[in-house]
Design a protein with these regions (language model features):
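Conserved NAD+-utilizing ADP-ribose enzyme module
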Residues: 1-97
């Protein structure tokens, strides 16, 4: 099972960015990339990288349905909106490879 990282606040809120009218959760390949992106975006100041795996994805599916949207971040030094846009169903296969 593949593990990624996302940014979460101590109260449990997930970090998301507005992208063309949708809120999308940035997903990172490692915690270092998440911290690099955090250092470049003051909106992430109160968020910390946490593991984002199939269990977390399933938790989101139960609470949000299949409406959750994501940005797979390949270069954390660029603006987050340059990530790969993925729907819930497009991200799910990445979690099991």
């Amino acid at each position: 099972m593949k593990t990624f990282y996302a940014m979460r606040r101590a109260n449990g809120d997930w970090f998301a960015v507005a992208d063309k009218g949708d809120l999308r959760m940035p997903i990172f390949k490692n915690s270092g990339d998440a911290m690099t992106a955090r250092s470049r975006d003051p909106g992430m100041e109160c968020f910390r990288p946490v593991t984002f795996d199939a269990g977390v994805l399933e938790e989101l599916r139960r609470t949000e349905g299949h409406t959750a949207s994501f940005l797979m971040i390949t270069d954390p030094s660029r603006h987050l909106k340059h990530g790969l846009r993925l729907s819930f169903t497009e991200l799910a296969p990445f979690m099991v490879t």
